[in-house]
From Swiss-Prot:
Keywords: Cell cycle, Cell division, Cell membrane, Cell shape, Cell wall biogenesis/degradation, Glycosyltransferase, Membrane, Peptidoglycan synthesis, Transferase. Its EC number is 2.4.1.227. Pathway: Cell wall biogenesis; peptidoglycan biosynthesis. GO terms for cellular component: plasma membrane. It is an enzyme of class 2 (transferase). It catalyses: Mur2Ac(oyl-L-Ala-gamma-D-Glu-L-Lys-D-Ala-D-Ala)-di-trans,octa-cis-undecaprenyl diphosphate + UDP-N-acetyl-alpha-D-glucosamine = beta-D-GlcNAc-(1->4)-Mur2Ac(oyl-L-Ala-gamma-D-Glu-L-Lys-D-Ala-D-Ala)-di-trans,octa-cis-undecaprenyl diphosphate + UDP + H(+). The gene is murG. UDP-N-acetyl-alpha-D-glucosamine binds at residues 195, 287. It is found in: Cell membrane. Cell wall formation. Catalyzes the transfer of a GlcNAc subunit on undecaprenyl-pyrophosphoryl-MurNAc-pentapeptide (lipid intermediate I) to form undecaprenyl-pyrophosphoryl-MurNAc-(pentapeptide)GlcNAc (lipid intermediate II). This is UDP-N-acetylglucosamine--N-acetylmuramyl-(pentapeptide) pyrophosphoryl-undecaprenol N-acetylglucosamine transferase. It is a peripheral membrane protein. Pfam families: Glyco_tran_28_C, Glyco_transf_28.
Length: 352
């Protein structure tokens, strides 16, 4: 039986594509393994999925671009993670390793290359994260969502592989209940803050609940179960799975962070959106780049977190609603998306 090892973690964005690809390989008779951190979100998501995947936990250390005494300890963790991954590779003898990035992926990528296992990696953002910059040196091939520099000879630009589609599905019973609390004459605004929610969105909704629910139906994915609420024109929930796409479809506008996975999901269904990217003080600046790219393409509006107020947000919402056809036409004309089936066929071809 052929074997494939997946790796990637730290955030949902570094796990999502793996979760979409693994069932395809399982259906085709592959034995699927995953290397990650048992305390990480990658382990939680695989357990939730119920997929027949063997999980191998390794030591991980965070890759920092700045000086920290923790870097000294983390160097040892990364080295130990490489040793652990090498033993896993030598024991399994897989045909290939697929990495979605994140600091947990570096040891398995290095170990795979050392043990002669072909390495395929995927980069979602406009600029490579530090983990993938390291991984690229050991990779057989990298697939990218955005165009990359021509000097990166191992990169193939494939566009975004998204987990949502424009196919309409039957409404879940829970969605019917949510809609019964909404005023159908008002536009519906969905706040999406990534896998852990976004404190700034949660605070805005909390501080301006009265004003917002007078003018909009509000859906707030919070990442915090203490905020859960279903009331007149308001639905707040910590986390959703099956409801994710139905809520996307229900919304007239989405207010989101600038993670590549989410904004390309919105592009795939031509959904109006305002991007509030994480700034450089909280990230490496990838979300700022993603947001600027989407604004330049005419797909979205952006708003810096430091400028986010009720008034500034409503100005953006009003602009999007009044120019809905223009934004949707540009999104529908985009050539930057690839279906999961097409990407899987491309990957299988490269593995053969």
């Amino acid at each position: 039986m052929k074997k494939i090892v997946f790796t990637g973690g730290g955030t949902v964005g570094h796990v999502t594509l793996n979760l979409l690809l693994m069932p395809k390989f399982i259906e085709d008779g592959w034995e699927v393994h995953y290397i990650g951190d048992k305390r990480g979100i990658e382990h939680q998501e695989i357990l939730k999925s119920g997929l027949d995947v063997t999980f191998h936990s390794i030591a991980t250390g965070k890759l920092r671009r700045y000086f920290s005494w923790q870097n000294m300890l983390d160097v040892f963790k990364v080295c130990w993670g490489i040793v652990q991954s090498l033993f896993i590779m030598l024991r399994l003898r897989p045909q290939t390793l697929f990495s979605k990035g994140g600091f947990v992926s570096v040891p398995p990528v290095i170990a795979a290359r050392v043990s002669g296992v072909p390495v395929f990696i995927h980069e979602s953002d406009l600029s490579m994260g530090l983990a993938n910059k390291i991984a690229y040196k050991f990779a057989t091939k990298m697939y990218s969502t955005f165009e990359q520099a021509s000097s990166l000879s191992k990169v193939e630009h494939v566009g975004a592989v998204t987990k949502v589609s424009d196919q309409k599905n039957p409404e879940p019973d829970e969605l019917v209940d949510i809609q019964s609390h909404f005023n159908h004459k008002l536009p519906t605004v969905l706040f999406v803050g990534g896998s852990a929610g976004a404190r700034v969105f949660n605070q805005l909704v909390t501080d301006h609940k009265k004003e917002l629910t007078e003018r909009y139906n509000i859906i707030n994915l919070t990442g915090d179960s203490s905020l859960n609420e279903l009331s007149q024109n308001l639905f707040r929930v910590d986390y959703v799975t099956d409801l994710y796409q139905p809520l996307m479809e229900l919304a007239d506008i989405v207010v989101t962070r600038g993670g590549a996975n989410t904004i390309f999901e919105l592009l795939a269904i031509a959904k109006l959106h305002v991007i509030v990217p994480l700034g450089r003080e909280a990230s490496r600046g990838d979300q700022l780049e993603n947001a600027a790219y989407f604004v330049k393409k005419g797909y979205a509006e952006d708003l810096q977190e430091s400028d986010l107020t009720l008034d500034s947000l409503e100005e953006k919402l009003s602009h999007l609603l009044s120019h809905k056809e223009d934004y949707q036409a540009k999104m529908k004309a985009s050539k930057e998306l690839k279906s999961l089936a097409d990407f899987y066929q491309l990957l299988k071809k490269d593995l053969s």
